[in-house]
Amino acid sequence: MTKPSDPTRDSHVAVLAFPFGTHAAPLLTVTRRLASASPSTVFSFFNTAQSNSSLFSSGDEADRPANIRVYDIADGVPEGYVFSGRPQEAIELFLQAAPENFRREIAKAETEVGTEVKCLMTDAFFWFAADMATEINASWIAFWTAGANSLSAHLYTDLIRETIGVKEVGERMEETIGVISGMEKIRVKDTPEGVVFGNLDSVFSKMLHQMGLALPRATAVFINSFEDLDPTLTNNLRSRFKRYLNIGPLGLLSSTLQQLVQDPHGCLAWMEKRSSGSVAYISFGTVMTPPPGELAAIAEGLESSKVPFVWSLKEKSLVQLPKGFLDRTREQGIVVPWAPQVELLKHEATGVFVTHCGWNSVLESVSGGVPMICRPFFGDQRLNGRAVEVVWEIGMTIINGVFTKDGFEKCLDKVLVQDDGKKMKCNAKKLKELAYEAVSSKGRSSENFRGLLDAVVNII
């Protein structure tokens, strides 16, 4: 990719991104902030061409800090390879080739920059970065893009397996994980696949297990969260790592940057006509879409409830909606292929967020003080949903885990109308205040970001 001209360099940081899901974007957000704070340090950002193309626009060079250089690495897919359709196949191919691909591109970047890399800042998934850092005499800074609960589940995988037993797990799914301080309300069935159930021998499961074993070797581990959200887990994790830093919510830290709000479908203008706390915002992220029957149930529940709504739904899924739904609800709500989520969750009219409970979405909802209705699918989403409902008490999981017309209607009524919903809103507002306090100039997340800057470039 085209690279900005370089000022004089004092140090060189290699940033290694995981190019799947929503991992690369928050790592780039952190990289931009660090680069702006340390203009004499070069940050070489390594990612696949496909992922980079979605992160950087053609005119991005003008806005990108001059000390960020962008490199494309191979995706690990052999020439002429035919995908079999196996789940996580692309991830497996990438991971198998990643260590050598990263080494090769880092060497190229060192030649171009004229400065050896002295810090590897990577997605925490890259357990092999521990050995890479040792090889080149560099520090390793790892970024966990999800929450403290899921990080703890992977850090303590061996302990959980020893306590629960992988063979007996089917009989113990409802038990809570009391053996880990801060996870006493988390059930076995809430843990991500690959901890004690699912395919423990998959490439992805083994990667997460190796990650949990390797992370204590890192110079520092940082996370997109804030300390008051999980204080007990924060203290626990701080005792396990050389340095553990909550630097989020990143969405609030980056809000100081002047960014033009993209709203091509007029969602925010539509919201201006709605009363405070009345609108249901519905989005399940960029990776998953509920199955057809659940999409129909959501539509039927919305129509029957009369609740105003903004629904972010891929165009290819519109055919799954009940016939005539869009026409009948034209005055009630809007269905759009993309919505400005952060701005919608900050809007006074938003009363509930119907979500898959991906970590970025949860944190954005917390930052907006908006209660949630959760429909988790995989990974850390069940953990996040459990925390939303039982730990923080700022929402609820959909009844019986899947959308039905009646179940969804009851959830909307509970959150938007009933006293339970008022309590959720109150709790969400308190967490919002703590989130903003954390990123204030003297807040803990701001202080931790300065600590991260120190760990990465040693300029303080």
Curated annotation (Swiss-Prot):
Keyword Amino-acid biosynthesis: no
Reactions it catalyzes: a flavonol + UDP-alpha-D-glucose = a flavonol 3-O-beta-D-glucoside + UDP + H(+); quercetin + UDP-alpha-D-glucose = quercetin 3-O-beta-D-glucoside + UDP + H(+)
Phenotype seen when the gene is deleted: Dwarf phenotype and altered flavonol glycoside pattern. The accumulation of kaempferol 3-O-rhamnoside-7-O-rhamnoside in the mutant inhibits basipetal auxin transport in the shoot, which correlates with the dwarf phenotype.
Binding-site list for UDP-alpha-D-glucose: 145, 339, 341, 356, 359-361, 364, 380-381
Active site: 23 (proton acceptor), 123 (charge relay)
CDD domains from the UniProt entry: GT1_Gtf-like
Pathways involved: Flavonoid metabolism
GO molecular function, one term: anthocyanidin 3-O-glucosyltransferase activity
Keyword Chloroplast attached: no
Signals that turn on the gene: By PAP1.
Keywords: Glycosyltransferase, Phenylpropanoid metabolism, Transferase
SUPFAM superfamilies: UDP-Glycosyltransferase/glycogen phosphorylase
GO biological process: phenylpropanoid metabolic process
Known function: Flavonol 3-O-glucosyltransferase that catalyzes the transfer of glucose from UDP-glucose to the 3-OH position of quercetin and kaempferol. Possesses high quercetin 3-O-glucosyltransferase activity in vitro. Catalyzes the glycosylation of anthocyanins from UDP-glucose. Also active in vitro on benzoates and benzoate derivatives.
Family membership: Belongs to the UDP-glycosyltransferase family.
Protein name: Flavonol 3-O-glucosyltransferase
Organism: Arabidopsis thaliana
